[in-house]
Design a protein with these regions (language model features):
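Active-site cores of enzymes that catalyze phosphoryl transfer or operate on phosphate-rich substrates
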Residues: 1-14, 112, 256-330
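Conserved DEDDh/DEDDy metal-dependent 3′-5′ exonuclease domain
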Residues: 18-124
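Short acidic-aromatic active-site loops that bind/stabilize oxyanions
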Residues: 22-29, 279-286, 304-311, 338-346
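Alpha-helical packing segments of well-folded alpha/beta enzyme cores
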Residues: 32-39, 289, 345-348, 352
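A generic secondary-structure signal for well-formed alpha-helical elements
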Residues: 40-43, 57-61, 65-72, 117-121, ...
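Extended catalytic-interface subdomain
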Residues: 97-162
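DNA-dependent DNA polymerase catalytic subunits
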Residues: 136-227, 231-246, 255-263, 270, ...
Length: 597
């Protein structure tokens, strides 16, 4: 069935008109489409929001209309749906991605939130926010990446400056010696976390660190090693930092030019500099976005409200702007900018760590723009918070970049590597004043089945009720109970559906794995090519000789079926998944695989 419902962005709107069209009430598909057209005319929406409409709904309706030799008139004034672009598959950063077809409604906006990255991150509010900044129509923007939006903003800035827009990047990387390459070709700073569980932890985060470095250190393709400034003399330091306000930054550059202070801004470690006399192109692009995001964050009342959605999509714009400085095809990119930004980020984080240690704090972990601190002097809770506030002021003054208290955690657990025992850099979970912060474990992975996700959720909920070390036994019991339910056939089969991204066609696979089995079964059942998408299936019998018999696709599963439909090999497969997921939670507390087996 299809439901056409008016959903106003204004919370005060009382218009909740709904028009439902159920295909089961129609003798043939043609009458269903005709009824749907009547519904669209009756409700007459300006914006049509679908979930996977470009990949499922509109292709199906257009196929029905084509078979019946009629039009699909869902636009205004009885105009047909327009296929502006067919689906395409391409490689992006080593990952095969499918861009779905683009179905446009004449006179209306069709936004497919199921396939829109910006829509998923910021909803309609986020799409409107970026559309205003970039000048890209909302309907087009919903099918583009943040990179396309930042490119549009850069082009607009270039046109406002009266500067020709490069057709494509035409500048090669500067020649470097082997030693210079080793020193400069590095990313942000990572410090290995101290293993185990830590209590009373403060996490400090720099706000928009990389974009703020671009703005405050005047990093842009035309400002790196400029001819108007002098290289840094050995032993001389230049601590000039440009303000985030573009007008104030322009004024600072002009005053330095008038005073003939033409010493470049030294980049740490790599021996290069940026201009101090002319405010750069990239800083003028990112500074207004940083200011706008700061304003939106100040309006936030709760996580997930409209202001949070808007600031969240601006975060992705800023992240992309940094990434584009090192992207080989970016019109306004230059790898030396990327290297300088990373060098500054390492210096700023190390300086923050040094200031923290001077104030009696111990750094237990640091990642690029975040640092985790525990008290090293036995201070009271109030003394700790006072010290943290003072420390944040020092760091902000020293760096010229705002730093924020992300959260205060009652405890945080870093997950050790299964083989080496060394804690992983990006796998941890913590419980603080703002709730849970979880990174890297199965509950955060798209491929995880609902059964595993529920088990980990229950384990984490149990840990928050008391000191984790004292209730770890109850948490272990959740693992055994989940496995018991599986073996007794009490787990719904739909909760065991796992996902795999399809990166190759069936004939390109060299190993007969579960993804290949799912593709072969889909081909046997006449399903469409899933290249670049995800396939969803349940493992029922891994020992079967024919790959197509080892799994069942999600579309084949009866909602009433349970894990009793899985044979012993399938049960063992899911038990192994449960064991690994449980160890992600329990291993920081000293629980090993031997205890759970």
């Amino acid at each position: 069935s299809v439901e056409i419902k008016i959903v106003g962005l204004d919370s005060a709107s009382n218009d909740n008109s709904t028009y439902r069209v159920d295909m089961r009430n129609h003798a043939n598909p043609t009458s269903f489409l005709q009824e749907l057209e009547k519904g669209m005319q009756a409700v007459n929406p300006d914006v049509v929001i679908t979930k996977k409409g470009d990949s499922i709904d509109f292709p199906a309706m257009m196929s029905i209309a084509s078979s019946a030799n009629i039009g699909l008139r869902l636009g205004r004034d009885g105009r047909n749906v327009v296929l502006r672009r067919k689906s395409i598959t391409n490689w992006s950063y080593g990952r095969l991605v499918k861009s779905e077809a683009y179905h446009a409604l004449q006179g209306r906006l069709h936004i497919d939130l199921g396939h829109s990255f910006i829509g998923k991150e910021g909803g309609i509010e986020g799409l409107i926010e970026i559309s205003r900044i970039s000048g890209i129509p909302v309907q087009d923007l919903s099918r583009l990446s943040p990179g396309s939006a930042i490119s549009a903003i850069q082009i607009n800035q270039s046109m406002n400056d009266g500067v020709l827009v490069p057709w494509k990047k035409n500048r090669a990387e500067d020649i470097k010696t082997g030693l210079e390459m080793v020193i400069s070709d590095r990313g942000g700073l990572y410090l290995d976390p101290l293993p185990g569980v830590h209590r009373d932890v403060f996490e400090l985060d720099f706000a928009s660190l990389f974009p703020s470095i671009i703005a405050t250190r005047n990093i842009s393709p035309e400002t790196m090693k400029c001819e108007c400034c002098k290289p840094i003399i050995s032993g001389h330091s230049n601590n000039v930092k440009f303000p985030l306000d573009p007008k104030e930054a322009e004024h600072l550059a002009m005053s330095r030019a008038l005073s003939n202070d033409n010493m470049g801004l030294m980049v740490p470690e790599i021996g290069t500099y940026s201009c101090s006399l002319k405010y750069g192109f990239l800083p003028r692009v990112v500074a207004p976005i940083i200011s706008r995001r700061r304003e939106l964050k100040s309006r936030m009342k709760r996580k997930g409200d409209e202001w949070d959605k808007r600031q969240n999509v601006l975060k992705w714009l800023l992240v992309t702007c940094f990434g584009y400085t090192g992207y080989r095809n970016a019109r306004f990119g230059r790898i030396e900018c990327h290297e300088a930004i990373c060098a500054w980020s390492r210096e700023i984080l190390l300086d923050a760590k040094g200031l923290a240690e001077e104030d009696g704090w111990r750094c237990i972990h640091a990642i690029v723009d975040s640092i985790w601190l525990v008290d090293n002097e036995g201070r009271t809770s109030e003394e700790q918070r006072s010290s943290i506030r003072s420390l944040m002021s020092k760091i902000e003054y020293n760096s010229g970049i705002r730093i924020e208290l992300e959260d205060f955690y009652k405890w945080i657990a870093f997950i050790p590597n299964k083989k080496s025992g060394i804690p992983s850099l990006t796998k941890y979970f913590a419980h603080g004043e703002k709730g849970w912060k979880i990174r890297g474990i199965e509950i955060r992975q798209h491929s995880t089945c609902n059964w595993i996700r529920k088990m980990q959720t229950d384990m984490l909920k149990n840990l928050q009720f008391g000191p984790p070390e004292k209730i770890i036994g109850q948490t272990i019991g959740i693992f055994f109970e989940s496995v018991s339910n599986l073996t007794k056939g009490e787990v719904p089969l739909m909760d065991l559906v796992i996902s795999r991204r399809v990166r190759k066609r069936p004939e390109e696979y060299r190993v007969s794995n579960l993804t290949l089995a799912a593709l072969l079964r889909g081909k046997l059942l006449g399903q469409e090519d899933l290249l670049g998408r995800k396939t969803h299936f349940v493992v029922v019998n891994r020992s079967r000789r024919e790959p197509v018999d080892r799994i069942k696709l999600r579309s084949e599963i009866n909602p009433n079926c349970s894990s009793s439909a899985i044979n012993r090999d399938g049960i063992e497969f899911y038990k192994a998944l449960a064991l690994r997921a449980s160890l992600s939670i329990l291993s920081p507390f000293g629980i090993t695989e031997d205890i759970l087996l």
